[in-house]
């Protein structure tokens, strides 16, 4: 069996793959002399094909990397840019080499992953500073990776981003977080009070809401974590928890008096015996969140 790191384990692979991952330059020269296209993906398994440079970078085979680049391998492939592979699998020597030969440090792959995210996926935390120093700065590009890193609870990594000026309130939508949460909202959704306090201590804003109006406090209420909810309540403006202010906020919705009374009561749920849903539970009046459905 041949293990190509996280690309998979294979019973057998084409000889050219062995030549690439073992740095057999004479074998590569022989293939080139017979018309081999060094940018054409190689079928490694039934559902797995990878370019020669990708294989060399994944396996960190420097002789093959250098030979392929010298013979015209594409460094800025749209699906798998060499810089992302280098920071995910390689070391400083490999990273510097591909950059010196034209690799784009701002490249994104086919699923819009950038260099910081790639390094985190590969757990190559030592490459984060290298990426920043090469001009793909934390201040401009680090927000997405920082938010994704919240759930890993690696405080050393989070310290790196914060110390280098990351936007701690980054909340742009993406495929993972289309509802525009801040890192603090993500931590609240994972019911991680320690992380929430850490983020607040470093300047996270407790009042920024998600796309549907949920903020850290209301997320804590929804999750049923009253300790976290009380923590956020002490940090929020007093008017957020004032009944008259809430009624003014809800006035445009023209709520029936019966509904207002229900939301002020102690029983905030009702059962649905003939439905796929067991019951519906509501937030208290002061914690309701106005939002628009659809457009």
What are these regions (language model features)?
Residues 103-166, 174:
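Solenoidal tandem-repeat scaffolds enriched in leucines and small polar residues
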Residues 56-124:
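A generic tandem-repeat structural signature
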Residues 8-18, 41-55, 76-85, 108-116, ...:
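Ankyrin-repeat boundary/"N-cap" motif
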Residues 212-295:
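A surface-exposed partner-binding patch
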Residues 29-38, 66-74, 96-104, 129-137, ...:
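Ankyrin repeat domain, specifically the short helix-to-loop turn at the C-terminus of the second helix
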């Amino acid at each position: 069996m041949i293990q190509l790191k996280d690309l998979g384990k294979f019973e057998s692979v084409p000889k050219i793959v062995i030549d690439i991952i073992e740095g057999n330059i004479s074998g590569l020269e022989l293939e080139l002399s017979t018309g081999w296209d060094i940018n054409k993906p190689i079928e490694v398994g039934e559902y797995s094909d990878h370019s020669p440079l990708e294989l060399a970078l994944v396996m960190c085979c420097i002789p093959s990397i250098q030979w392929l680049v010298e013979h015209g391998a594409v460094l800025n492939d749209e699906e798998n840019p060499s810089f992302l592979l280098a920071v995910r699998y390689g070391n400083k020597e490999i990273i510097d080499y591909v950059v010196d030969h034209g690799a784009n440090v701002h490249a994104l792959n086919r699923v819009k992953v950038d260099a910081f995210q790639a390094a985190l996926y590969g757990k190559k935390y030592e490459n984060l500073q290298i990426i920043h120093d090469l001009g793909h700065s934390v201040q401009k590009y680090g927000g997405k990776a920082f938010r994704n890193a919240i759930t890993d609870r690696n405080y050393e990594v989070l310290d790196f981003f914060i110390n280098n000026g990351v936007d701690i309130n980054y909340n742009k939508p993406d495929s993972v977080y289309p509802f525009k949460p801040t890192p603090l909202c993500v931590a609240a959704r994972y019911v991680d009070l320690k992380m929430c306090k850490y983020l607040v201590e470093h300047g996270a804003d407790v009042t920024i809401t998600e796309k549907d109006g949920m903020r850290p406090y209301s997320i804590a209420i929804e999750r049923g974590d009253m300790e976290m909810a009380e923590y956020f309540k002490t940090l929020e403006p007093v008017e957020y928890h004032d009944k008259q202010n809430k009624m003014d906020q809800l006035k445009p919705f023209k709520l029936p008096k019966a509904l207002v009374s229900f939301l002020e009561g102690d029983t905030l749920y009702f059962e649905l015996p003939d439905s796929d849903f067991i019951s519906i539970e509501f937030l208290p009046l002061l914690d309701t969140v106005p939002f628009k459905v659809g457009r």
